[in-house]
């Protein structure tokens, strides 16, 4: 993950950045140039980066297949606290060409490894309020075991590899850029706990 994320606009649902403000933004930071999508018909893969709210039903529609006996859907949502601090919202940014390339690699490898009928990954950018989804992962497979394992692996690969930067914004006015890492019930990074034991 890059050490310093690119700066981004923080559009809200109630206001739209002015045309003159957007004209000065590079295209990858301009919300009006989204959604950015990438598909691979070979493996029934659909990938999306968007500033709009995510649609879980759309994810299941994309992964639907007559050969699928199992569909797994994961929604990652913004929670209201982090390490005891009240969170007001999250904000995400990325460089789409690189992010879509990484997502395609993750989805293609999972489709081949788990013999998936479909893979859908959508990541929201910009401001994501409390209780709204920042990521949707859906997979379909012939049987539930493959679908469960594939869904989890796709999510963990996205968290580990995707070039998306997350800014946690707090009610007290503070903010922190964070890496997407797996945390335990106390909020501690799981990888760090494993390293401490070794």
UniProtKB/Swiss-Prot annotation:
Cellular component per GO, a single term: molybdopterin synthase complex
Record-listed substrate binding positions: 143-144, 159, 166-168
Name the UniProt record assigns to this protein: Molybdopterin synthase catalytic subunit
GO biological process: Mo-molybdopterin cofactor biosynthetic process
EC number assigned by the record: 2.8.1.12
HAMAP family per record: MOC2B (MF_03052)
This protein's UniProt keywords: Cytoplasm, Molybdenum cofactor biosynthesis, Transferase
CDD domains: MoaE
Function recorded in the entry: Catalytic subunit of the molybdopterin synthase complex, a complex that catalyzes the conversion of precursor Z into molybdopterin. Acts by mediating the incorporation of 2 sulfur atoms from thiocarboxylated MOCS2A into precursor Z to generate a dithiolene group.
Subunit structure: Heterotetramer; composed of 2 small (MOCS2A) and 2 large (MOCS2B) subunits.
Low complexity bias: start-end ranges: 1-27
InterPro entries tied to this protein: MoaE_sf, MOCS2B_euk, Mopterin_biosynth_MoaE
GO molecular function term, any single one: molybdopterin synthase activity
Keyword Cytoplasm: yes
PANTHER family xref list: MOLYBDOPTERIN SYNTHASE RELATED (PTHR23404)
């Amino acid at each position: 993950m890059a050490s310093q994320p690119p700066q981004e606009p923080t559009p809200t649902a109630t206001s739209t950045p002015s045309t003159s403000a957007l004209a000065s933004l590079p295209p990858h930071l301009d919300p009006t140039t989204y959604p950015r999508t990438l598909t691979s018909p070979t493996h029934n893969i659909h990938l999306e980066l968007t500033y709009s709210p995510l649609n879980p039903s759309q994810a299941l529609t994309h992964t639907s297949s007559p050969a699928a006996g199992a569909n797994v859907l994961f929604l990652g949502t913004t929670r209201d606290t982090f390490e005891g601090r009240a969170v007001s919202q999250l904000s995400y940014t990325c460089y789409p060409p690189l992010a879509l390339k990484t997502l395609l690699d993750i989805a293609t490898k999972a489709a081949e490894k788990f013999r998936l009928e479909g893979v859908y990954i959508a990541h929201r950018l910009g401001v994501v309020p409390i209780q709204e989804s920042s990521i949707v992962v859906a997979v379909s497979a012939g049987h539930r075991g493959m679908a469960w394992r594939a869904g989890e692996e796709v999510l963990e690969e996205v968290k580990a590899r995707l070039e998306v930067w997350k800014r946690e914004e707090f009610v007290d006015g503070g903010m922190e850029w964070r890496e997407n890492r797996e945390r335990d019930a106390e909020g501690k990074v799981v990888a760090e706990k494993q390293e401490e034991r070794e």
